[in-house]
Each structure stands twice: as structure tokens, then as C-alpha cells.
């Protein structure tokens, strides 16, 4: 099977290999390595260089991409190819210069016999198989040198030699037995005797008695004595025991008193320490877990007044103090100071299993006050006794350390390890000398399993607390992100709502402007047409196309006005007096094209109503000036109400024959009616219709719209002649009667029409000599301009040609009376 080769992708960018390399690669794959080296060695032998570079090895490693190999036979080089790799691999010039290693086989090592007598067991038989694992002790240079000396002496004595493993194992066993026996000696009366002293009391409850299940335990480092229940020791360890501060190697100061040392427990934070006795006697402080008597909690519940108390015994304000339990005594003192001074500190068990603490000051302790001189000599004696006890303990400990070898028996070690006692005695003497040279310090560190466990527990607590804080921080970060996302969402919603509100206000503003703005450019010149043709074709304008347009008219007009098709026009728009004087039929609306889509109208609804109301008022005014008609004539009312269709633009279906007259002729008609010296061609009188052609109910004005939709438009010829709109410019030249009419599009008059209405009246007053009432007529229409922008003055109104010929002279005599009637009508409206 071929060896795995490294596959390299050959390209012109990262390699200089050519097709020649490919052929050499394929050839090198078929050839073996020795055959490839034969061609190179003769040249090397000729030149005899010290080193050579072989390039065939790198060439043999590269294969082209097109070469068919299984994926297990090559590797893909992921690094970019370097040009210096083409130089080759440095190899020695002569293979004969390479030194050849010399290897020889050694016989298997047999364990030397260690028995001193023929019947003693050998080391290989009983010692090595039973030793568990390796040894904790490692030989140093001194041990190795001593072992050589020992083996030389044993060889001279014709005794078996001692190996290194046996020496290490014996030294470890000696150290283990010495540590165990010394710990046992410290715990017994032989070592110190302080545990069995009658004066030893619990550091928490100050009781010298122990019970079954509540033994008194001593710390092996600080020698503090506590009960199991008082310090929260769930199980008494078999070996040594250390308090929490000694296990952590710290010497903290109590948070509630100035004393250092003693039975301390940490707070919840783990950074501050409090005496268990202080936590029990100060009423505000509590203990989290009574079984373990930790952690100390509710430190913050201590009032400031207690922190401000000064101890009467040590004269310090450090920490917090308790006060005498007598009602009239306020003496303050620290808990530990009271214990050290021997004050009366009682623990009372109530009937409900409640523990009560009662403390008394120096004055109330033992039933009476203590004199200062008697208390002063007592203090030095107690201090001396304590010092003597400590000194005695240290002396005994030092003596035990100096006589360490007395705690170990060589025979016991030989029996444990199943070795010869004489050999173990040699090692025992060497161990004793080496340990004395080390200042009686052990050669091996003792197995402090309990200390390690306590430290590990503390580390585990700190690690769990750190992990808890980490998770808490992560949770807070998630909460912050959620709050930020909610805030951003609400801001976005607020922005969108505000934007929609602004859009709504802008739309309403535009709608209000469209409703209140006067349409500009709506009034234009109407189409010119003969009055006779309009009179003949006006009543016949109801073609089938117009009827279809009449049906669709109301819906389109109401839809363009923003109203539904079921909107009650008669009850909403026609309740006022001005609206009742105008009859709006569906046919008129359809034929006059109230189109909102035309480019000239921006404001359909105000233009529709205001212009029609204005036209109705002007029509009424013209009727008042006409002497041939009476105010009570129903024909005049009907004609006044039916002037609306003449104001509209011709529908697209109406051609030239039905086109209305152009507004250019209307100023001439107005001058013909009002002025006496007006010159113009005589107009023919069209046939006049009677009141029989009017709608059936002309006087009401509040009839519903469907009734007017079915009735045909009355007096079309006369209405078209009388109500044709005037142009804004009154100085337009009027063509002769021979000129053919031109159909022109109508435009609404702009807002400036209000100002232009007054000028024709002024000119007529100055040029023709009319009464002042005629000149004041535009003022009447100006009153309507503030409310309805589509009102016109009297000069813009036109009457039929017959009225211009018959009542031209009589009109001037009735101007003053007509003015007063119009004013009364305006006030009534």
C-alpha cells in the first residue's frame, strides 16, 4: 500500500512548477526512495561537499489536481506555498559519517533477597506486591549518597542491598506514624492537659460542662473551646479540627467588639466577622442558620443609638454595647468585655422554649457593688495564670517536637511493611538524624484533609457566590435590554402616532381650506349661441343619454361632495330660506356637470351652494325690478327657483345647437336694462311660458329631491337667457348679431370679482345719470360676499330680451323701492 502523500493545488499564482514537474512527480511516485537517491550521490561524492539540498523529496510530495487518488492517500496543504520551499531539504553529504547506535540487551533485574536468615521472607515475596501505589517521599542527593554507603556496608557484610523504592517507603511510614502519635499526644493529658482543666469553658455560652452529642471541641491552632451546638459543628472530626478563621488563615476583628480571636462566624457577605456570643447577646442581630450558627445577619438593624454607646469597662466606642438588665441602670459594656471581667451573664430558658439573656453590670453583679481595689489585684493574677498556661503549653509542644523519635517504634514499621527489623532500624537511625538536622521539622507535610476540606468549602462558597453574582448581572443585563427594547418600541409607537396625528391635522387643514377657499378661475366665457336656438332646443334637451346621466348624476355629485347616496338633501341643505329658493334636480346636476375632476375647480361644495344662493338672490332682485311680474306670482317664484341649470357648464353630450350664450353679451344686456341711453340691436322676444309649465309645488321649496328629479326642467330658453353668468371684465366688446356664436368653456369668477362689481355701478351712475339707489346696488351684494362668495351684483344679472325692451324705462323708477325690498329680504334670511 502506498504511503499517504500531501496534495497541493498547483497554480500559476503560488507555484513555479510546470508540466515537467508533473511528469517527474508521477515518475517519482512509481519509484522508491533509494532509487531516487542513487542518481544524486555520485555527484556528491565527486564534489564532496559538507551538506547538500535535495529537491526531489519536495517534488515527489506534490501531485497535480487532476491526479486520481483516494482521499486517504493525500493531504491538502492549506497554507500558501512559499517559494523558498523549492530550494529543497538540507541533508548530510556522506551517509557513512552518520554514527551507528550500539544496543545491547541486559538480563532481567532480579530483586535482591532481604532476609537476614534463611527462614525470613524476601522483599519480593511479601513487600512490593502489597504496597499500594507509589511513595509520597522522593529521595534527594543526600539520601542517594547514604544509600550507596549503606549498600557498600551491606555488601561487605554479605547481606542483600537496599533499593531506592524500599527506602522511600520506609521513610514515608516513619513520618506518618510520627504525625499520628504526636496529634494523639496533643489531645491527651500527656501532651498538654489543658483540655481537662476545670477552668476551661465554652467561648460562646461560658459553660464548662459537656454533654453526649454536644461535646466540647478545641481548635488545634488557636485553642478556642466551643460546644458543638454553640459553634454549629454538625459532626466532630476524627482528626484535628480548626475553627473557621484558622481554617482560612485569617485573624479578623469582630465587627461588634474590639476583641480579636475567639469563636467568630462570618456575615452574609463573607468579608466581616462577628463573635457568636456578640450575635447572641445583642438583641437586633440574628443568625441565619441555627444548625450551622452562620451567617450572622441583620447587622444593619442595629440602631445608631447602640453604636454610639461607650463601654464602661474598656472605655472604647468601638462596636456596639449592651446595657444592664436592671430597670434603673443604663450602664453599657461590650459582651466580650463582660465575659473577660467576670460579670454576671445569665441565660434563662423560658417555659415556651424561648431563651432569654440577662446581663448585669459590675454594680449589680453578685448582689452588690464591687470595689475597685479588689478588682484590680484580681486582674493581674488571672493574666499571670493565663500566661503560665500558655507558656506551659508551648513548652510541652516544644518538648514533643524534640522527642519526636520516641513516638515511633522501628519494630512496628517492620511489621507493617513486612521487612527485616535490622534493615528498618538502619533506616530509622538515618531518619532521626536527618529530621534533627531539619530543626525537628517533618520531612513530609502532614495530610491535612480537614483543613483542605474547609478551605475547599470556603472556595466553593466564594465560587458559588461569584457565579450567583454573574448570573444576577446577566439577568439584570437581560432586564435592561428588555426595558430598552420596550422603551424603544413605545418611542417608535409614539412617533408613529404623532406622525399620523400630524398627517390627520394636515389633511383636515387641507379639507377646511378646500371648503372655505373661493374657487378661482371657475367662471369663464360661456359658449355663444342664439337665444332662439336655445329657446327651441332647451326644452328638448332630455335625450336618452341625458336621462342616463340624470340617473347617475346624484350619486356622482354626492360622492364627490363626500356624502352618501342616501344623504337627505331636502332635510340638510334646504331647510333655510335661501336654500328653499333654489331647486336642485338630479337632471340639472347631471347636465350642468358639477365635476370635481375638472382642472378649474378645487372647492366643489362651497361653490355649488354659495353661487346658487347668490344667483337666486340676484334673480329675486331682478324680478323686483321687473314691472311685468308681481311678487306674489307663482310663475316668478318658479322661474326664480329654476335659474340654477343656466349657471352650469354644458354637458359633453350637448353640442353647438344646445350651447348657451356667451357671457360677452351679458354686460350689454345689463346696460340695456339699467341705462336709458344704451345703444344696441333690438332683441327678439321669445315666447313666454305660463305657470302651467312650472312644477306642481312651487311655493314650498322643501320638497324632496326625487320629486324634482322626475319633473322636466321648466322655462329652459328664458332661464338660459336670464341667468347666463357675466365675465369679470365688463369692457369686452359685444359682437354684432351677424356673428355666429362660438362655444366656449365657462370659468368661475375669481375672488377679485367682489372688487370689480362696484366699478360698473359707479360708471353707470356717472355716465347715464341714474339715481343713487342704482349706484348703491353693489353694496347689497357685498353683504353676501362675506358668507357666500358666489353672489353677484345687479350689473352682472341679465334678463330676457323682452324684459329689456318692455321694462327698460320703468326699471329706473322702481330702483329705490327694490333696494329696500332686497334689504328686507336679506335681513329676513
Curated annotation (Swiss-Prot):
Q: In which pathway does it act?
A: Protein modification; protein ubiquitination
Span of zinc fingers (PHD-type) = 199-249, 309-365
- Bias category Basic residues: which stretches? 522-535, 637-650
Q: Which PROSITE patterns match?
A: EPHD (PS51805), ZF_PHD_1 (PS01359), ZF_PHD_2 (PS50016)
**Which GO MF terms are attached to this record?**
histone H4K12 acetyltransferase activity; histone H4K5 acetyltransferase activity; histone H4K8 acetyltransferase activity; ubiquitin protein ligase activity; zinc ion binding
Q: What is the documented disruption phenotype for this protein?
A: Strongly decreased level of KDM1A polyubiquitination resulting in increased level of KDM1A protein. Decelerated emergence of neural progenitors and mature neurons. Embryonic stem cells grow in aggregates with smoother-edged, rounder-shaped cell clones and fail to organize in rosettes with surrounding cells exhibiting neuronal morphology with extensive arborization. Decreased expression of neural markers.
Zinc-finger (C2HC pre-PHD-type) residue ranges come to 251-285
Q: Please indicate if the UniProt record lists Repeat as a keyword.
A: yes
Catalytic reactions on record: S-ubiquitinyl-[E2 ubiquitin-conjugating enzyme]-L-cysteine + [acceptor protein]-L-lysine = [E2 ubiquitin-conjugating enzyme]-L-cysteine + N(6)-ubiquitinyl-[acceptor protein]-L-lysine
GO cellular component annotations, sorted alphabetically?
histone acetyltransferase complex; nucleoplasm
Which terms are listed as keywords in the entry? Acetylation, Metal-binding, Phosphoprotein, Repeat, Transferase, Ubl conjugation pathway, Zinc, Zinc-finger
Q: Which residues carry this modification: Phosphoserine?
A: 9, 15, 117
Instruction: Give residue spans, biased composition: Acidic residues.
Output: 792-806
Give residue numbers for the modification (N6-acetyllysine): 32, 38, 298
User: Where in the sequence does UniProt note compositional bias of the Polar residues kind?
Assistant: 9-39
Start-end of Basic and acidic residues biased regions? 536-552, 776-786
Enzyme class of the recorded protein, top EC level: transferase
Region annotated Disordered sits at 1-52, 362-383, 517-555, 622-817
What biological processes does GO assign it?
neuron projection extension; positive regulation of neurogenesis; protein autoubiquitination; protein polyubiquitination; regulation of cell cycle; regulation of cell growth; regulation of DNA biosynthetic process; regulation of DNA replication
Instruction: Determine if Phosphoprotein is one of this entry's keywords.
Output: yes
- Cross-referenced InterPro entries: Enhancer_polycomb-like_N, EPHD, Histone_Mod_Regulator, JADE2_ePHD, JADE2_PHD, Zinc_finger_PHD-type_CS, Znf_FYVE_PHD, Znf_PHD
- Quote the entry's note on domains: The first PHD domain is essential for its E3 ubiquitin ligase activity.
Family label:
Belongs to the JADE family.
Task: Provide the function of this protein.
Answer: Scaffold subunit of some HBO1 complexes, which have a histone H4 acetyltransferase activity. Acts as a E3 ubiquitin-protein ligase mediating the ubiquitination and subsequent proteasomal degradation of target protein histone demethylase KDM1A. Also acts as a ubiquitin ligase E3 toward itself. Positive regulator of neurogenesis.
- For this entry, the protein name equals E3 ubiquitin-protein ligase Jade-2
Recorded source organism is: Mus musculus (Mouse)
Lineage start: Eukaryota, Metazoa, Chordata, Craniata, Vertebrata
Give the encoding gene's name: Jade2
